[in-house]
Curated annotation (Swiss-Prot):
ATP binds at G34, D35, N36, G37, A38, G39, K40, T41. Belongs to the RecF family. This is DNA replication and repair protein RecF. It comes from Rhizobium etli (strain ATCC 51251 / DSM 11541 / JCM 21823 / NBRC 15573 / CFN 42). The lineage of its organism: Bacteria, Pseudomonadati, Pseudomonadota, Alphaproteobacteria, Hyphomicrobiales. It is found in: Cytoplasm. Keywords: ATP-binding, Cytoplasm, DNA damage, DNA repair, DNA replication, DNA-binding, Nucleotide-binding, SOS response. GO terms for molecular function: ATP binding; ATP hydrolysis activity; single-stranded DNA binding.
């Protein structure tokens, strides 16, 4: 069983609809129930900001600050983390105009948000993701990269560095500055970073596929078969140095075409995640809404198990409205799977009765009007 990473305290100040909120947690799962709009998802969002990035809503930090507050917000968490007990604080200060939040770990300013992955890994599933299989490829790419990031914390930095290099190349091409040596230097960087990104994605999908195949018969949820398309399809069994050479040549040969298009037309930023319902041999986008939700739940749970197996530490799960639209038997099976992962899960719903099958495996909180009652 993986080590259980769990929050013991969560304190919010001027966060969304909370002027101040404090939760004392005992390591069990946390179930948050209350009316729609009470602030359940806001609590989940606060926990999600204990990972790199902008959290489960990807909101601008100015939008997170409570309306009517002086400005700024803060999140404090104490947890039993991957390296022992740790305290994490993050937020922005009043009057601070920034796209980056401040972060302290045990009172010491962190150099980068990537340091958070030394202490916990977070995965989430929210209603906004229900249209993942039918929506834009950029949403699936973002989902894919969060899966990779849970196993390879350097992936996020590679992706942002690639985007930065690509923007530089696009600007040079847009300005008509076709300096061969300058472009070659940028394209070499893009090739190195881009292939590393693509290989990390491919490796994660391979690991997840093998795990899924091993647990086919025991899961109450349909299993997904996963493929990548849109960039160097079918070539990733070749040596990385050869792939980098090919992509570098591809970029050099497409300069005029990319200049005309106003963007880079080939690269890992064009990759799409193709998902099929394994048992039905059907593309996920063609499945019913209920089947798509079940596929997504199964995929996230399988990935959570993979993270626990490979890191030795169970991820914290944020599952918003997870029990809605599931019958009683499937809800009970879902809770057993979540508990069997060995980690702590935060779950929300409007009806406490939907979580009865959890019994004493969970702490129950009621959320109402920006207040939390334990």
């Amino acid at each position: 069983m993986p080590h259980k990473v769990s929050l013991s305290r969560l304190k919010l100040t001027d966060f969304r609809n909370y002027a101040a909120a404090s939760l004392s947690l005992d390591g069990r799962h946390a179930v948050l129930t209350g009316d729609n709009g009470a602030g359940k998802t806001n609590l989940m969002e606060a926990v999600s900001l204990l990972s790199p990035g902008r959290g489960l809503r990807r909101a601008a930090y100015g939008d997170i600050t409570r309306v009517g507050a002086a400005g700024g917000f803060s999140i404090f968490a104490a947890l039993d983390g991957m390296e022992g007990e740790v305290e994490i604080g993050t937020g922005i200060e009043a009057g601070e105009e920034t796209t980056a939040r401040r972060l302290r770990i045990n009172g010491t300013p962190a150099k980068t948000a990537d340091e958070l992955t030394d202490h916990l890994r977070l995965l989430w599933l929210i209603p906004a993701m229900d249209g993942l299989f039918t929506g834009a490829s950029s949403d699936r790419r973002r989902f894919l990269d969060r899966l990779v990031l849970s196993l390879d914390p350097a992936h996020g930095r590679r992706a942002s560095d690639f985007e930065r290099a690509m923007r530089s190349r696009n600007k040079l091409l847009d300005d008509g500055r076709f300096d061969p040596s300058w472009l070659a230097g940028i394209e070499e960087q893009m090739a190195s970073l881009g292939i590393a990104m693509a290989l990390a994605r491919q490796e994660m999908l391979g690991l997840l596929t093998r795990l899924t195949e091993e647990t086919l018969e025991s899961s109450p949820f349909p299993s997904a078969s996963l493929q990548l398309s849109g960039f160097m399809d079918g070539q990733f069994s070749r040596p990385s140095v050869d792939l980098e050479d090919d992509y570098r040549v591809m970029l050099a040969e497409s300069r005029y075409r990319d200049a005309g298009a106003g963007r880079t037309l080939e690269g890992p930023h064009r990759t799409d995640l193709v998902v099929h319902h394994r048992e039905k041999a059907m593309e996920a986008a063609r499945c019913s809404t209920g089947e798509q939700k079940a596929l997504l739940v199964g995929l996230v749970l399988a990935h959570a198990r993979l993270v626990g197996n490979l890191t030795g530490h169970a991820p914290i799960l944020l599952l918003d409205e997870i029990a809605a639209h599931l019958d009683e038997n499937r809800r009970a099976a879902l809770f057993d799977i979540i508990d069997g992962l060995g980690g702590q899960a935060f779950m929300t719903g409007t009806d406490r009765g939907m979580f009865t099958a959890l019994g004493d495996r969970a702490q129950f909180f009621t959320v109402a009007d920006g207040r939390v009652f334990g």
